[in-house]
Amino acid sequence: MYHCFRLRRGQDLYEEIEAYVKAHHIAAGAVVSGVGCVSRWRLRDATGVRVRSGEEDVEIVSLMGTVSEYGCHLHASFSREDLSAFGGHLLPGCTVTVSYT
């Protein structure tokens, strides 16, 4: 079964994905793609220790991971206006500013 949904300006990217999974009783699944922009981002590195965050308009260039009734494990990559890219483990605190149709 496939699911596709759109988020609105001001929603939290991570929390809305997690809420969708719970609301639709998805026991296990995968996020294979996501597009749009966020104005606030929050990521964790692979060690699980360092958390980085920022407030700037960045574009989602990659969004993938696993989802389940026990939680989400999502990776995101973002691109800045100068086209530099960065990414990590997606955390709550990423505010959607633009979503595409």
Model-based region annotation:
Residues M1-R9:
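Short amphipathic
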